[in-house]
A protein has these predicted regions:
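Short, basic and Ser/Thr-rich N-terminal targeting/leader segments
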Residues: 21-25, 71
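Small-residue (primarily alanine) positions within well-ordered alpha-helices
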Residues: 10, 14-17, 27, 37, ...
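Residues that line or immediately flank small-molecule/substrate-binding pockets and catalytic motifs
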Residues: 43, 77, 101
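Helix-adjacent hinge/juxtasegments
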Residues: 47-51, 55-88
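Zinc-dependent deaminase
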Residues: 1-20, 68, 81-150
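Short beta-strand scaffold segments in enzyme catalytic cores
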Residues: 25-33
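Short beta->alpha transition motifs characteristic of CBS
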Residues: 36-43
Length: 150
């Protein structure tokens, strides 16, 4: 599968989050070119501030492969991860991060911080942003615009 195809799947997860009135962020994890888990924001659904799409996908992937390390895995997320999610990605030893839209308020990869480039981290994550950035941004803008109307 191509990265754009994988981001389309992550966007579908983000749309699913919006159906549940969650901030529309979706995520998938691949290992050996196969999708092993999906995640979407579930903070409201689970009454927990930490149930971001990345956390959901990482926990699911770890459970599926029966290991807390996701070495050689790639994570695709529609929005630039926050600090908490970046640390989870590092701790899971995920190899590659691909994200869609930048997050100017809490994005810890390139927007408010370059967290994944910090020398104190014990694992290096390769990252590239901008995959289907327009589609990811529009989904978020539409979601928040609908919130302001109500």
């Amino acid at each position: 599968m191509y990265k754009d195809d994988l981001m389309v799947i992550a966007l579908e997860e983000a749309k699913r989050a919006a159906i549940y009135d969650e901030v529309p962020v979706g995520c998938i994890i691949t290992l050996n070119n196969e999708i092993i888990s999906l995640g979407r924001n579930k903070c409201i659904e689970k009454n927990s501030p930490i149930r971001h799409a990345e956390i959901e996908a990482i926990e699911s992937a770890c459970s599926i492969i029966n290991n807390y390390r996701l070495c050689d895995a790639s994570i695709y997320v529609t929005l630039e991860p926050c600090h908490m999610c970046c640390m989870a990605i590092v701790n899971a030893r995920i190899e590659n991060l691909y994200f869609g839209a930048k997050e100017p308020k809490t994005g810890a990869v390139v927007s408010v911080d370059n967290f994944l480039d910090k020398k104190f981290l014990n694992h290096k994550v390769n990252y590239i942003g901008g995959y289907m950035e327009r589609e990811s941004s529009e989904l978020l803008k539409d979601f928040f615009a609908s919130k302001r109307k109500t």
